[in-house]
């Protein structure tokens, strides 16, 4: 009887162990799946982080490229501006320098030939060219009369006679006309005098 009891108990124990093993085995794959999913997620996150880092690196490199391009553009603009500035003033500078260089040379020549001090002290008298009609007595007399009126000095004619008498006569006529008051500034005017006892107190109206 005891043997039978033992035999009957053994399969119960075996079934219990099998059921426990089955439970453990059924739980294990679930845990493994979760771990796999977590690992996959972590890997994906790492990949995303790497991608983000790569993108950041790319952005940085793009920014660097943009900055270098901007610098190149500025350099190009500066170069073009410098070229245009250098080309523009070349044309007007050359004649200006030539004119400036001519002036001091001319002034130096004038100073060497005729000192400035002598020019200031000398009277500004016009130098007349030689008259080709000097042989003509009428033309020479007219020229001498013009000089006589300007300078009020007696001069000789081509015949050797002095014009001093003519000059004195014309001056006397002018004085008599001005004193009489008949003509003033080329216009005739009337002079009315108020007679008084004292001739020095006569008033001209």
UniProtKB/Swiss-Prot annotation:
Superkingdom to which the source organism belongs: Eukaryota
Biased composition (Low complexity): 32-79, 123-132, 146-162
Basic and acidic residues bias (residue ranges): 80-122, 170-185
Chain spans, region Disordered: 1-205
Compositionally biased residues, Polar residues: 1-25, 194-205
Stated name of the protein: Uncharacterized protein DDB_G0285917
Protein source organism: Dictyostelium discoideum
